[in-house]
Amino acid sequence: WIMGHMVNAIYQIDEFVNLGANSIETDVSFDDSANPEYTYHGVPCDCRRWCKKWEYFNNFLKALRKATTPGDSKYHEKLVLVVFDLKTNSLYDHQAYDAGKKLAKNLLQHYWNNGNNGGRAYIVLSIPNLSHYKLITGFKETLKNEGHPELMEKVGFDFSGNDNIDQVAKAYKKAGVTGRVWQSDGITNCIASFIRGLDRAKEAVANRDSSNGFINKVYYWTVDKRATTREALDAEVDGIMTNDPDVIADVLNESAYKAKFRIATYDDNPWETFKK
């Protein structure tokens, strides 16, 4: 999965997919009452990026629905996965359940069209704080209460705080999550990737590939350089988040990687661990 980073303005959906992304990451900021409000990152953000592009969250969802609904004039067949980077650090821990509830209601109405031929992309809810695990509970229970528990099959999870993998496992246990787990690892592109290294990403890959692991997919962020792309592919990650999808696509075309990797399509289940 080539994951376009910080796609917060509607026009950027086309821009990133046209550069080669089959997945996008979108920031979601919340108001004081835990309502998802804007697709907005804010300052600071990655180097060489404008941090302040934004839309109202529901307007973005409607545009995203069009981009992922077959037959729509804005449809992109290859856009198959969306990561919502949920900026819940602005909330109190006790608001996490409400944030999940309100997020589910917004997605149900504006993205899934109340279950009536809505957008088809798989969705990853990426949460920065392990203590906000109740966001998952709130999301799940709301879809059930609204009569659409089946839509949870399109939803996976990520804790994005670079926490100890054992602690991440405990948070999922509390949330009752037993699958559909993506694990992120990484650092802003402003800091040279070798300073962080790929040790934790490799630890996540080892968990993914073990018989008793809880992780299904691993992605590494934010990668804009060819050398780092190669290192991430050599570590056998499933996804690379990038500001420059064309760079990742170029490296995937190199002879060393062409035979081993391909770009995921809608038929590739993002919740299944890939067996070599």
Curated annotation (Swiss-Prot):
UniProt family annotation: Belongs to the arthropod phospholipase D family. Class II subfamily.
Keyword Endoplasmic reticulum belongs to the record: no
GO biological process, alphabetically ordered: killing of cells of another organism; lipid catabolic process
Protein name: Dermonecrotic toxin LsaSicTox-alphaIB2iii
Top EC class, one word: lyase
Entry annotation: catalytic residues: 5, 41
EC code: 4.6.1.-
Cofactor details (free text): Binds 1 Mg(2+) ion per subunit.
Keywords assigned: Cytolysis, Dermonecrotic toxin, Disulfide bond, Glycoprotein, Hemolysis, Lipid degradation, Lipid metabolism, Lyase, Magnesium, Metal-binding, Secreted, Toxin
The keyword Lipid metabolism appears for this protein: yes
Function, as annotated: Dermonecrotic toxins cleave the phosphodiester linkage between the phosphate and headgroup of certain phospholipids (sphingolipid and lysolipid substrates), forming an alcohol (often choline) and a cyclic phosphate. This toxin acts on sphingomyelin (SM). It may also act on ceramide phosphoethanolamine (CPE), lysophosphatidylcholine (LPC) and lysophosphatidylethanolamine (LPE), but not on lysophosphatidylserine (LPS), and lysophosphatidylglycerol (LPG). It acts by transphosphatidylation, releasing exclusively cyclic phosphate products as second products.
InterPro entries: PLC-like_Pdiesterase_TIM-brl
Superkingdom per UniProt: Eukaryota
Protein's cellular compartments: Secreted
Tissue: Expressed by the venom gland.
Entry cofactors: Mg(2+)
Glycosylation-annotated residues: 129, 253
Disulfide bonds: 45-51, 47-190
Residues that span the membrane, as ranges: none
MF terms in GO: lyase activity; metal ion binding; phosphoric diester hydrolase activity; toxin activity
Main location per the UniProt record: secreted
Cellular component terms (Gene Ontology): extracellular region
Reaction equation(s) it catalyzes: an N-(acyl)-sphingosylphosphocholine = an N-(acyl)-sphingosyl-1,3-cyclic phosphate + choline; an N-(acyl)-sphingosylphosphoethanolamine = an N-(acyl)-sphingosyl-1,3-cyclic phosphate + ethanolamine; a 1-acyl-sn-glycero-3-phosphocholine = a 1-acyl-sn-glycero-2,3-cyclic phosphate + choline; a 1-acyl-sn-glycero-3-phosphoethanolamine = a 1-acyl-sn-glycero-2,3-cyclic phosphate + ethanolamine
Binding site for Mg(2+): 25, 27, 85
